[in-house]
Each structure stands twice: as C-alpha cells, then as structure tokens.
Amino acid sequence: VRLLAVDNFATIGKLLSQEDCVSKILPIVASFSQDKSWRVRYMVALQLYEVCECVSADVVKEEMLPAYVRLLRDIEAEVRIASAGKVSKFCQLVGADASVSSILPCIKDLASDSSQHVRAALANVIMGLAPVLGKTLTIEQLLPLFLALLKDEFPDVRLNIISKLDQVNQVIGIDLLSQ
C-alpha cells in the first residue's frame, strides 16, 4: 500500500494548497524516504522532485533537502540511481548555495560509487548542474568530477558525459573545456 501511495503524492500535492501540501504530504514523503522497504524509498526518489514542485524553494530546502540527501546516500543502488537521475532538477529547485553545501558532497561520492549504473545515471545529468552553479563553481567543483567520469571504465558513463558536454560548454566556454 505504501508503494502505491507514493506514486500519487505529486498528483495530490498539486491539488492541495501549498500550506496543506506542506502539512499533509511532505511529512509522509519524508517519512517514506526512510522506509524499511527499498522499493518504497525508490518510489520516493522517483517522485520527490515532482512533490517538491508543489511547494516553495524555501520549504524544499528546509523540509525535503535532508530526505533527498538521504536518498542519494541510500544503501540500495537502485535508490541511488533513481535519486541521482533527479540531481540537476533538484539543484535547480534549491539553488546553488544549498546544492554546494548539501548535494555536491553526495555527488562526489556517487561519482566514485561501486555501482557502474549509479555512475552512469549521475553522468547523464551531472552536466545540467553547470548552469545552476555558474562558471566559477563549475570549474572548481564539477570539472574534476567530469574528468573522473570521462575516465570511467564503464563505457556508458563516458558516453553520458560526452553526450552532454554542450551544457558545460555554455557555462565555462570551449577554451577551458578543451584543456
């Protein structure tokens, strides 16, 4: 039942007022992000961004950012894959400061995750962080991760990075990227 309930949180949240969503939906989602069943946590990871769209960025930072960080650090690879796939969207929602302080340490861990599928999921979306972080933070924080992922032993990881290079190019420029 919990598994099926998670699938409807975003839909219900969009029908409620923001205050009702904060008081009724977010506490349940936060609780389910710690559920003993990895499948429930997986569904929360898939739906969390859509639920967060129903409330303000400040509420997301206060209420849901800790839940998202927990999902990024989950013991199950499937949960990490699902949450890593939403990292760019979530960072756009919370902004550069919260992304650097809370999410970027998780991204650094995921870039060297033992699961190649987690690294591939991250590589598919990590380039989308460049516009959120801006030129300086992209150069300082993300460029080393891009380079590490470009050297990954798993070809899907490298392919995902290469296919998204245009997003970084728009932020830091071709000259720096080609170095």
What role is predicted for each listed range?
Residues E19-S33, D58-L72, D97-A111, T136-L150, ...:
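HEAT/HEAT-like alpha-solenoid repeats
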Residues D7-T11, P27, L46-E50, P66, ...:
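Residue-level signature of alpha-solenoid helical repeat scaffolds
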Residues I12-E19, E50-D58, F90-D97, G128-T136, ...:
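Residue-level signature of the C-terminal ends
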Residues V1-L4, L16:
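A generic tandem-repeat structural signature
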